[in-house]
Amino acid sequence: MRMILMFDMPTETAEERKAYRKFRKFLLSEGFIMHQFSVYSKLLLNNSANKAMIDRLQANNPKKGSITLLTVTEKQFARMIYLNGERNTSVANSDRRLVFLGEDYSDEN
């Protein structure tokens, strides 16, 4: 499942800009990926992870502006239509799981 977070925060004063930067850094540290300037998404494995993320967002709520959450399935997220721009195909934006085992075993000898 995917959590989509959309927000608008005031940035007129230095204090408001600081709150905006702090919230954005929090989102990035939690694994959110930016789709547009104030639209982020995060891949969640199940409903328990969704509820836990909502709790962490509430604990880090900047209290000003508007923050909206929408949780959709991966199938729904994959059907997103792009009128302009391109789909982000990075590994971080994929629901495929990667497994890293041990050290780097490249062919360098």
From Swiss-Prot:
Names of required cofactors: Mg(2+)
GO-annotated biological processes: defense response to virus; maintenance of CRISPR repeat elements
GO MF assignments: metal ion binding; RNA endonuclease activity
EC annotation from Swiss-Prot or TrEMBL: 3.1.-.-
InterPro entries registered for this protein in UniProt: CRISPR_associated_Cas2, Virulence_VapD/CRISPR_Cas2
Designated gene of the protein: cas2
HAMAP family: Cas2
Record protein name field: CRISPR-associated endoribonuclease Cas2
Lineage of the organism: Bacteria, Bacillati, Bacillota, Bacilli, Lactobacillales
Function text: CRISPR (clustered regularly interspaced short palindromic repeat), is an adaptive immune system that provides protection against mobile genetic elements (viruses, transposable elements and conjugative plasmids). CRISPR clusters contain sequences complementary to antecedent mobile elements and target invading nucleic acids. CRISPR clusters are transcribed and processed into CRISPR RNA (crRNA). Functions as a ssRNA-specific endoribonuclease. Involved in the integration of spacer DNA into the CRISPR cassette.
Disulfide bonds: none
Keywords in alphabetical order: Antiviral defense, Endonuclease, Hydrolase, Magnesium, Metal-binding, Nuclease
Record family assignment: Belongs to the CRISPR-associated endoribonuclease Cas2 protein family.
Amino acids binding Mg(2+): 8
Subunit: Homodimer, forms a heterotetramer with a Cas1 homodimer.
NCBIfam families tied to this protein: cas2
CDD domains to which the protein is assigned, alphabetical: Cas2_I_II_III
